[in-house]
Amino acid sequence: MSKKKALTSLPYLASIVFLPWGISLSFNKSLEPWVTNWWNTSQYETLLNEIQENNVLERFIELEELFLLDEMIRDYPETHIQKLRIGIHKETIELVKMYNQDYIHIISHFSTNIMSFAILSAYSILGNEELVTLNSWVQEFFYNLSDTIKAFSILLLTDSCIGFHSPHGWELMIGSVYKDFGFSHNDQIISGLVSTFPVILDTILKYWIFHHLNRISPSLVVIYHSMNE
């Protein structure tokens, strides 16, 4: 009977997996024009805030130095000097537009993810009965396995997620989430998360093995440690 209930709850589980993608796509399409209009009308004059100003000025100085270097190498007449100033002005405008678009992208993606999280949380609370049914079925299935298979399954899962070869996978996943929120790629932040997040998970797992598995099946813990060594 519990297996039958679990099977009826599988569509709910599938909807939880695929619902965020659908929400993200639909909200991105509908939110981005609104965010673009709001940003361009109310925020364009204050675009060069402290962070943006530093970024734009750094790039502007680089461009100006390149143009001035070009000017020193060649003996430009006055008309060419005027074109030089116009070129710097155009490059500055393009730079401001680029940073403007980047911030629109960040705001729209961040807002979409917040809304997706809120909708998914409400959906999970409303479907709490299905989640409880699935959880009980998974626990029943796991406890019916032999201790050797249990230990092998736990070891396979942990080595895949937080083992020696897992950092590259974590780097890809964290980078994907970081990009999904609209932020530009940052190696230092991603490396910091990759070096700390798996360690936290490993600590939680060891506590779970010691506190939970040692209470329900001491032999499973012994087999797990033997296989792990």
UniProtKB/Swiss-Prot annotation:
<keyword id="KW-0375">Hydrogen ion transport</keyword>
<keyword id="KW-0812">Transmembrane</keyword>
<keyword id="KW-0633">Potassium transport</keyword>
<keyword id="KW-0934">Plastid</keyword>
<dbReference type="Pfam" id="PF03040">
    <property type="entry name" value="CemA"/>
</dbReference>
<protein>
    <recommendedName>
        <fullName>Potassium/proton antiporter CemA</fullName>
    </recommendedName>
</protein>
<dbReference type="InterPro" id="IPR004282">
    <property type="entry name" value="CemA"/>
</dbReference>
<dbReference type="GO" id="GO:0006813">
    <property type="term" value="P:potassium ion transport"/>
</dbReference>
<comment type="function">
    <text>Contributes to K(+)/H(+) antiport activity by supporting proton efflux to control proton extrusion and homeostasis in chloroplasts in a light-dependent manner to modulate photosynthesis. Prevents excessive induction of non-photochemical quenching (NPQ) under continuous-light conditions. Indirectly promotes efficient inorganic carbon uptake into chloroplasts.</text>
</comment>
<keyword id="KW-1001">Plastid inner membrane</keyword>
<feature type="transmembrane region" description="Helical">
    <location>
        <begin position="106"/>
        <end position="126"/>
    </location>
</feature>
<keyword id="KW-0406">Ion transport</keyword>
<keyword id="KW-0050">Antiport</keyword>
<dbReference type="GO" id="GO:0009706">
    <property type="term" value="C:chloroplast inner membrane"/>
</dbReference>
<keyword id="KW-0472">Membrane</keyword>
<dbReference type="GO" id="GO:0015297">
    <property type="term" value="F:antiporter activity"/>
</dbReference>
<feature type="transmembrane region" description="Helical">
    <location>
        <begin position="154"/>
        <end position="174"/>
    </location>
</feature>
<keyword id="KW-0630">Potassium</keyword>
<feature type="transmembrane region" description="Helical">
    <location>
        <begin position="189"/>
        <end position="209"/>
    </location>
</feature>
<keyword id="KW-1133">Transmembrane helix</keyword>
<feature type="transmembrane region" description="Helical">
    <location>
        <begin position="7"/>
        <end position="27"/>
    </location>
</feature>
<keyword id="KW-0150">Chloroplast</keyword>
<dbReference type="GO" id="GO:0015078">
    <property type="term" value="F:proton transmembrane transporter activity"/>
</dbReference>
<comment type="similarity">
    <text>Belongs to the CemA family.</text>
</comment>
<keyword id="KW-0813">Transport</keyword>
